[in-house]
């Protein structure tokens, strides 16, 4: 981990300038190899150590969703930036939940609920975003899609862990002929 952040002077300066962030970092990377690997893959998350919401154990999911949609709306013509923003937002929230877990703020069940809620929000937001880009191909673009994303496995059981993948099935029930390919692209 230190090798990764030592390549960027800004990260070292941040840790030097904010000793409490360095202590939080030591707690996180000292607690599990998964946490250290996660930060190694996403060193930008060091900024989260300065966020006052880091240890807020009950995310306000409505505000989270609204803020994410507002930030996405600023990049409506830049799909790459939208995808980056979705990833960055997800990584930051996972890191917050990880820090809270390490601090003992969640039971296993409560943490699984929070991770599952996060996955639900990210899936719905992504689906909405993709539909906005594809709906012009539908015979009735003003109608909502007749499309469902079904989570099974750990997501379906609301038992997600930090390293869980998402097992998904996509279903559509649209009476319009020739929309199967559109829904396949949406999935």
PLM region spans:
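Non-catalytic regulatory/linker segments of enzymes
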Residues: 1-187
């Amino acid at each position: 981990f230190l090798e990764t952040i030592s390549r960027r002077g800004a990260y070292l300066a941040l840790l030097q300038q904010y000793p409490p962030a360095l202590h939080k970092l030591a707690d996180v990377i000292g607690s599990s190899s998964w946490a250290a690997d996660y930060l190694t893959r996403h060193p930008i998350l060091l900024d989260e150590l300065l966020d006052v919401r880091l240890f807020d154990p009950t995310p306000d999911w409505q505000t989270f969703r609204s803020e994410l949609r507002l930030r996405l709306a600023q990049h409506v013509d830049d799909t790459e930036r939208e995808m980056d923003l979705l990833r960055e937002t997800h990584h930051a929230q996972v890191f917050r939940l990880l820090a809270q877990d390490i601090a003992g703020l969640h039971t296993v069940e409560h943490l699984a609920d929070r991770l599952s809620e996060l996955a639900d929000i990210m899936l719905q937001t992504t689906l909405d975003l993709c539909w906005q880009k594809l709906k012009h191909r539908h015979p009735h673009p003003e109608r909502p899609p007749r499309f469902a994303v079904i989570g099974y496995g750990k997501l379906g059981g609301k038992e997600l862990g930090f390293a869980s993948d998402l097992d998904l099935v996509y279903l559509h029930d649209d009476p319009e002929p020739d929309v199967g390919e559109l829904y396949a692209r949406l999935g």
